[in-house]
């Protein structure tokens, strides 16, 4: 009987093994296809976020795909000319800027952060926040102020020749060292702010333990504070280098050739949009290398999450105290006080006579672009923040991360890629459809405000997403759940519960985007519609002609507007420490 049952048992075993294998294969397929399957098994309330996030991520990926496709057709004659005359200098200048600005912002930002956060000296309390004010000055404004001041025909050298004779001559300000110094003074606040926050957040017990063990302030800084602050310092240096690579206005003032100026000259000199896109892809590659290097240098370090403290650990006295005060005052004067005073002088001498109808038009154009870009960008960032909160699936998280990559794209790269994509759409879709419908058959997307607003959206969506995500994270899930239990849902839930709580973060995000759009030069210069000039474009036109005094009026306007988010940043920082 047992022998008779053996075939049946073997059949059952084989079937069970086959079923087990099928079950394993099914589980493996579910694990490997989660991003595709999760949409179908998600709750309907979560499923609606997928198409929105995918569309937003696609808008950010559009410039990247266009840059890759631009290599399908290469103009050998133009590239031969560029390689023989431009590329070696572009690569050398870019490497020089990366090394010089990277070292400079690190030394300057870390030294100032250490002094103002851990040391006590005369003037520390107001220098602590005053050193953040250079955030308000665009790089191209500080560049033309320094060139106008220190050039051979400027007031400084003219005065020195009157005092010491005609033979006295300072080193050329329009040099590699000059542009590096200006970019260091503009971008050191990134390192200063993040390093200062990291130093303040470090545990007081560690530093006191180092003092008990006989470590000097320098040894405690080098062995304890600096390694703990390395992630924050690395992030600040990466931001400074990204802004350096994306800069167009400052290097144009100094006649210093970089990839951004080469993109502009290729576009308007050779009239080759595809070659400009290929140069933009090389610039983007350099940006990615910088970001990868920052991540590798940071390693597995973790920033401290302790509460910031407000009391200094080291009380400087005598010459060291006044040396610390003098160093901080010198940086503050060079980066903010002297440039602003010189702008005021130029405004009174010449700039005030430009207060006419044309300047009113510049203000209106600038305000329109800033307000529209802020509304669109904040709205899209709200969608991403809510999608991340309501449907925290792998696909949504990946889509939100992709959508936030736009800030790493320089404005010139975005301009070239979007214009190339819109040129293709006009040629292959808009013009044929318009002609078929009996229209004029003219391009509608190329050179339109929609293209410029799309560039602003892609570049500054990260700026808006950060404050909104932080504000949304502070809202406890119990609040909307209680509102739903009372019958409040849909749009009423958003306007009655979420919006009042998100209002401070929303206003902060809108203000940050508004100010960044006002100061954005390369994307606005390359993509603006014909006759649609802004304050940044006006500054570029005047500085290109050496009209420093006439550029003072729009420059002062941008500086005053740029002070608004900086003041808010200072207030939040003071509130956290107190």
Segments predicted by a language model, with ranges:
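Transmembrane alpha-helical segments of polytopic membrane transport and secretion proteins
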Residues: 1-53, 124, 294-330, 568-578
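A short amphipathic helical element positioned immediately N-terminal to and/or at the very start
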Residues: 35, 39, 77-83, 344, ...
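Membrane-water interface segments at the C-terminal ends of transmembrane alpha-helices
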Residues: 44-75, 85-200, 228-248, 276-295, ...
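Polytopic alpha-helical membrane proteins, predominantly small-molecule transporters/carriers
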Residues: 91, 214-215, 223, 363
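Short glycine/proline-centered loop/turn elements that form peptide/ligand docking sites
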Residues: 202-205, 475-479
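Glycine-rich helix-loop "coupling/hinge" segments at transmembrane-helix boundaries
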Residues: 245-271, 519-548
């Amino acid at each position: 009987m047992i022998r008779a049952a053996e075939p049946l048992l073997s059949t059952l075993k084989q079937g069970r093994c086959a079923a087990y294998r099928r079950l394993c294969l099914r589980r493996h397929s579910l694990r490997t296809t989660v991003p595709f399957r999760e949409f179908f098994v998600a709750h309907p309330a979560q499923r609606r976020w997928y198409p929105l996030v995918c569309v937003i991520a696609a808008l950010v990926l559009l410039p990247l795909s266009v840059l890759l496709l631009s290599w399908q057709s290469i103009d050998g004659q133009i590239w031969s000319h560029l390689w023989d005359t431009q590329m070696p200098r572009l690569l050398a200048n870019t490497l020089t800027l990366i090394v010089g600005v990277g070292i400079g912002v690190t030394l300057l930002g870390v030294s100032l952060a250490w002094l103002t956060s851990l040391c006590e000296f005369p003037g520390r309390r107001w220098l602590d926040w005053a050193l953040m004010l250079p955030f308000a000055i665009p790089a191209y404004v500080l560049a033309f102020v320094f060139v106008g001041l220190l050039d051979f025909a400027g007031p400084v050298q003219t005065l020195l020749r009157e005092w010491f004779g005609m033979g006295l001559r300072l080193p050329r300000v329009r040099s590699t060292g000059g542009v590096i110094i200006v970019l260091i003074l503009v971008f050191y606040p990134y390192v200063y702010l993040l390093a200062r926050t990291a130093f303040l957040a470090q545990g007081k017990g560690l530093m006191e333990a180092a003092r008990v063990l006989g470590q000097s302030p320098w040894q405690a800084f080098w062995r304890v504070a600096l390694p703990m602050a390395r992630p924050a310092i690395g992030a600040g240096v990466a931001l400074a280098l990204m802004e350096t690579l994306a800069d167009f206005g400052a290097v144009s003032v100094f006649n210093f050739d970089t990839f951004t100026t080469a993109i502009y000259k290729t576009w308007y000199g050779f009239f080759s949009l595809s070659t400009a896109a290929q140069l933009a892809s090389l610039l983007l590659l350099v940006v990615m290398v910088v970001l990868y290097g920052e991540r590798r240098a940071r390693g597995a370090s973790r920033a401290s999450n302790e509460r910031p403290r407000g009391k200094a650990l080291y009380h400087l006295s005598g010459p060291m105290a006044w040396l610390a005060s003098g160093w901080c005052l010198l940086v503050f004067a060079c980066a903010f006080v002297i440039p602003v005073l010189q702008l005021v002088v130029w405004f009174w001498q010449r700039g005030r006579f430009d207060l006419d109808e044309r300047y009113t038009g510049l203000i209106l154009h600038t305000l329109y672009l800033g307000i529209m870009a802020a509304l669109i960008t904040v709205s899209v960032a709200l969608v991403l923040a809510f999608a991340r909160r309501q449907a925290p699936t792998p696909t949504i998280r990946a889509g939100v991360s992709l959508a936030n990559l736009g800030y790493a794209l320089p404005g010139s790269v975005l301009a070239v890629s979007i214009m190339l994509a819109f040129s293709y759409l006009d040629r292959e879709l808009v013009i044929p459809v318009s002609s078929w419908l009996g229209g004029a058959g003219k391009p509608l997307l190329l050179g339109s405000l929609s293209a410029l607003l799309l560039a602003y959206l892609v570049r500054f969506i990260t700026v808006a997403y950060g404050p909104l995500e932080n504000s949304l994270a502070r809202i406890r899930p119990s609040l909307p759940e209680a509102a739903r239990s009372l019958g409040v849902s849909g749009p009423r839930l958003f306007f009655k519960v979420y919006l009042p709580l998100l209002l401070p973060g929303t206003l902060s995000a809108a203000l940050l985007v508004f100010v960044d759009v006002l100061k954005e030069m390369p994307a606005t210069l390359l993509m603006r519609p014909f006759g649609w000039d802004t304050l940044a474009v006006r500054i570029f036109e005047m500085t290109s002609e050496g009209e420093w005094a006439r550029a003072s009026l729009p420059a002062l306007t941008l500086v005053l507007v740029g002070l608004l988010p900086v003041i808010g940043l200072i207030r939040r920082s003071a509130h956290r420490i107190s």
